[in-house]
Amino acid sequence: MGKRDIPSPNENIAPRTIGMRDVDLTAAPAKKAKLDTGERIAVSGRVASVKLTNFMCHANLQIDFKTAQNNCFYIGGPNGSGKSALFAAINLGLGGRGSDNDRGNTVKSYIKDGTTQSKITITLTNAGLNAHPDFDDLISIERTINQASSTYIMKSVKVTSSDNHVERIVSRKKADVDRIVSRFSIHLSNPAFWMSQDRSRSFLANFKPANVYKLYLESTNLENIRLSYIRFADALDECFALIQLKAGEILNEQKKLKRMQEQRDLQAKLDQDRALVASFCWKLLFCKVRDYNDQIELTLKKQEAQKTLQDETKKEYAKNRAARTEVEKKIQEFRDEVEVQDAEIAEAREDLDAKKRKVLEFEEKIRECEQSIRKKTSEKKYMERTIVNAKNEVRILLEKQGNQDLTKRLTKVENDYKDISQQRENMELGGESAKLREKLDTVITDYKRKEEEKYTIQRDINQLRRKIEQDMETMRRSRATKKDAINKFGSHMAEILMEINRSKSRFQTVPKGPLGKYITLIDPKWAFTVEECIGNLANNFLCSSHLDAEILRNIFQSLRIPAQDRPTIIVAKCNGRAYTNLHEPSSDFKSIYRVLKFSDPDVHNVIIDKSNCEQFILIEDKTEAMELMGSNYPPQNAVKAYTLDGSQAYANGPNSQYRFYSGRGGHARGTFGNDQGDVDEGALARLIEDTKSEAMRLETQDLRKQDHELKVIYNERDQTKAAIDEFDRKLSNLRSQELQKERQAKDLRAELAQTANEDQVENLNESIEEMQKKIPLIEDEVKDILKNVADITADMAPVIQERKEAEHTLAEIQKETRDFASKSQKLQNELSKYDDAGEILKIRLDKVKADEGVFFHTEAKLKSERDDAMEMVENDKKNHPMPPGETDPPDLSSFPSTTEAQRKIEEMQKAVDRATVGCDTTITLECVKDFKDKLKRLKYLCRMIEDVLIELKNLHAARVKAYPSLKKFTELKVCNKFQELLAVRGHFIGGLEFDHEKETLNVNVQSSKEKDAMAGRRPEVLEVEEVDEHSYDDDSDDSTGPRRKKSKKSGQKKKRVRDLKGLSGGERSFVTAALVMSLWEVMEQPFRMMDEFDVFMDMMNRKLVMDLLVELATKKFPHNQFIFFTPQGIKELNMVDGLQVFEMNRVRD
């Protein structure tokens, strides 16, 4: 029974309930398909009751659905009875929106006119499948709608055995209502389950394929599923991004934990350092007493040593004085002897000078005689040569007088000339010379080729040997560097610097070196290039004067450094100011100077002067360097460019010519770097041995083979050359003989033409006789001169002997004098030593006497101060408690000196203070432990979340993969169900056709009027005719429906269409109901609602559809609740089990 609080003339007194009655199922059409009878199962979420207060046209309305016995409910009544209001109230009461019910855009528009508040109470069942365990038998949802807002109250209702209802409020939150609705699978916005009046009319009136497809997607929720998959994928990506972000935060937290642990370690170290400082301070209290004891003991030892020293010094001074007296006596004796020797030397020197003058006179006479002898001898030789020449002329003249003999000789000479000429021509034209020379060229070519091969092998050997030397030098430098880093500039560099430091007082200005020590390479990439450029200056020393340079050379010599290992010394003025106006290239280019950093201005100036490195630019690529420096406009002030492998490109300019020298390549030796100590000596030694083996192999095998082959070719070449030389010699002899014979013949012909000259012969004979007479005279003169020389030599001999005796005497006297002088000097030196030693001994005695009193007073003073210090220690002990583990007094045997201890305490205290500044004392062990546990939990949670996300991602991927199958299965299920429902009527042929690309759903159904014509063949696939949104058919028999417009002119050819245009309004409504019921098949909801579904049906279709709906609800879907609203009469409805009917009266006009 319906109930209300305030009666109204225009309001239902009570909805009238019609009971169940028998229905004759045989009245159905003969070809109606039978439906399977399903088992009735209790399902949670059905509507048990609805109560409305001031909702739309209802002031107070309550309807109770007997869900325990029924699952199909018909609510009938004329227009104005509030059926649609009840429909909307169920949707709104469960949390629906006002715009979803086509009765208003806002919720407040549903409040009854004249009132300010509306209330909807929906009671749902909570028994059977999917029941909520936290609620009782029923769930009541009460929504109160005000003008500004709406509120919810959700109650749990327990039904007692006496049918009493006990309520308890569970929640007042909309979110909890939404969760209950979602749990019961109630789709508030699904048009298939909430087929309102306006939605039914619009759907029946505008049955376009696109609209039907849209209804299909909304009803089956496929589109929402696809979009939810996309949103879920985005949400997963965001979650993974958050996990990554959280992982970064965890990493930061780990760093923070590490810093906290470091702080704890620092705190522990601080405690240890403070304990050590306390121990040192405790021992320092006693250090003063210890120092006084040590000083007193030292003073006593000094007193004993002073007394012993005084006695020994007195004895030494007495000995010194006695020895000095003896030396003075010896010196005086030597002085007397020296005076006598000086007089004898003067006398001997005068006698020697006289003897020398006599000898010189005799030697001058002998030289004059020897000059005369040479003159006479030369004159004699000239006469003898003249005689020989004259005799030869006479002989020649006499031979010319016999002409017959000359004719014979001429004939013989001419015959010989012809024979020799013939032999020469045969040798020149025979071709033997060309063959020999061709053979020689071949041998020389082979020889040069072999020499090239030998040169290549020798070059490889030399390169290997240079590499061996470089590697050995690297090893030596590495070993030297390990001893002292400065040795990278030379193996003796540490010794040199040590000796310079010891001898620095000898220098005017201490030399600076090695220069490489003051140079730092900024860019290590250019180490090899910089070494190529200024590496030879790295071990040089800079001296400010030549005197300092000479002292430094003496140091090199004293250290016995080999000449080849001695550093170069550069002498230059040192003013301590670096050059400023340098001729550098543009700043766009890197230069040798710009990659170096100088720590000394004088070294800076020397490197600039010696290398001009500020004008050497650096270019990595060799080709780029050649193009840049070889162009017509090279960089200004750039003299040349260096590359990474040490190649050099000189700039092309008006005063210079472009040149390029390829670098030898290699690795830097570490002169300007810190990598010298990183040499792997074991690997380097193995490399040296391998290189030596390779060099030995080349020398013993390849080189010897080349030498042997060269020797063979060399012998062949020499043999060929010898053959050529022999041939040339023979040919040359023949030519010489030919020329000689030709000249002899010419001379003989000339002699035959001459006549003998007798006067000439006579004159020559006279000249010969005259000169022969002069020769004996010259010989006699020479004999006289020789006799004179013999006499002078005889007279000079005794004088020479006397001179020798005088020289010997003088030498003997001078030797004795030198011996006396040497002995006298030695005595003088000895005397000076005794004087110096005596002076020192005297000073020592005076000092020892003075120290005697000082030591006595010092001892007394130290003892007094020690007593004061002991008293002070006792007072300090009161303010400085003894640290744990120490003794009183402490053991100071291994404790450092007081000054060193104070310095250490000060350093330790400063270190403690510095560490205290950076130490966070608020970090305790408990903090670290808690933070560590928290971080561990956080990491575990992140790991778990990440695992869950991966599992969700896999599930999502599986669902995305299964989505096409779900879509296809849904389509097949809807199509099959639609075919099954059409078969119930038995007058329709067709089905549903999906086009997912065009997003259309064609309902291809044909009336039974064409069934016979189309029997036995499939329906044609016909063209869809485009229909205006407001065009309808004219064959509807429902006068209440809207008027239809004509679709085509009568004269136009009819087309068979695929939509429902060819059906009547009732048939179209039946097909629509069949489609909606097909959609119900694929979606689950505890209850389904349809309002005015039969608006366009004729009586026959309406009854058929109503009975069909009842049968479907009660037999096919007994576990679902169906609520149908209709303005038509329901008296003709067959009453069956599971059906409950309500009739509502008109409440408004």
From Swiss-Prot:
Family: Belongs to the SMC family. SMC6 subfamily.
SUPFAM superfamilies: P-loop containing nucleoside triphosphate hydrolases, Smc hinge domain
Key word DNA damage present: yes
Main location: nucleus
InterPro entries, per database record: P-loop_NTPase, RecF/RecN/SMC_N, SMC_hinge_sf
The species this protein was found in: Caenorhabditis elegans
GO biological process assignments: chromosome organization; DNA replication; double-strand break repair via homologous recombination; meiotic cell cycle
Underlying gene: smc-6
Protein's job: Core component of the smc-5/smc-6 complex. Involved in DNA double-strand break repair by promoting sister-chromatid homologous recombination during meiosis. Also plays a role in the DNA damage repair of ultraviolet (UV) radiation-induced DNA lesions. Promotes efficient DNA replication.
Transmembrane segments: none
Binding site for ATP: 77-84
Protein name listed in UniProt: Structural maintenance of chromosomes protein 6 homolog smc-6
